């Protein structure tokens, strides 16, 4: 038993495409989701959005925080009502060309503040700025320096909203175990170590993604890899 264990959790994204396609999740399906989650009793939820299906209209470049809000609001309400900690974030910038855009930083943080402070969803405790930024499938393509710079800019923008900054911290670096992008200088442990060195005060919780197979788990190799990564996390911080 570990006091650092936060419980089992789930990835629960808010069906971004469904609303945009005019095929919203039905009330019956929401009831089924609630019933299943009631049984699971997750300790936390990771909720990621695609901004072009939410606050950013790619056709016009317009920012609209009320756009396609219903399903995200319903998901967060369930988490709020049931005391579930949420790590919320964005898979990628609105367009890949905006991966280092201050416009994205400002829109994204304003939207986060809207969710947490205006709508009252302070179940959101952590904010993820890129999904798996070490991956060659990400807009960052393993560029640690770009990711670090954006993390610093996001944190600085969050500081402009004092209530938000008090309630929400970064979850990082959100990288993939057992993977090394040839374009990146660092492996998983290296990303965690460098982010701790460069952003230790800004990161509230450290997170990595793991996709282990049965043999890796049963052989003990997976636990050993986790120990190596955990060793890079500063004392007093969770992974």
Describe the predicted segments one by one:
Residues 1-126, 135-136, 141, 145-179, ...:
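Non-catalytic accessory regions flanking glycosidase/transglycosidase catalytic cores in CAZymes
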Residues 74, 204, 211-239:
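Glycoside hydrolase catalytic-domain groove-lining segments
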Residues 88, 208-209:
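Short beta-strand->loop
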Residues 108-111, 180-199, 218, 222-226:
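Distinct, well-ordered alpha-helical segments
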Residues 130-132:
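Active-site neighborhood of divalent metal-dependent phosphoester/pyrophosphate hydrolases
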């Amino acid at each position: 038993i570990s006091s650092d264990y936060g419980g089992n959790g789930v990835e629960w994204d808010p069906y971004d495409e469904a609303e945009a396609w005019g095929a919203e999740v039905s009330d019956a399906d929401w009831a089924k989701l609630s019933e299943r989650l009631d049984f699971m009793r997750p300790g936390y939820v990771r909720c990621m959005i695609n901004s072009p299906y939410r606050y950013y209209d790619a056709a016009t470049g317009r920012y609209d925080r009320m756009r396609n809000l219903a399903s995200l609001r319903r998901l967060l309400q369930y988490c709020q009502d049931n005391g579930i900690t949420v790590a919320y974030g964005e898979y990628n910038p609105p367009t890949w060309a905006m991966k280092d855009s201050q416009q994205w930083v400002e829109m994204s943080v304003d939207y986060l503040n809207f969710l947490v402070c205006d709508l009252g969803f302070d179940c959101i405790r952590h904010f993820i700025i890129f999904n798996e930024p070490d991956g060659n499938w990400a807009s960052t393509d393993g560029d640690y320096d770009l990711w670090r710079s954006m993390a610093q800019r996001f944190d600085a923008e969050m500081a402009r909203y004092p209530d938000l900054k008090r309630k929400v911290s970064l979850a990082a670096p959100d990288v993939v175990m057992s993977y090394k992008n040839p374009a990146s200088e660092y492996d998983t442990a290296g990303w965690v170590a460098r982010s701790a060195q460069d952003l230790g005060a800004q990161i509230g919780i450290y997170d990595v993604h793991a996709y282990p197979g049965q043999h890796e788990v049963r052989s003990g190799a997976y636990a050993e890899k986790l120990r190596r990564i955990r060793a890079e996390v500063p004392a007093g911080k969770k992974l």
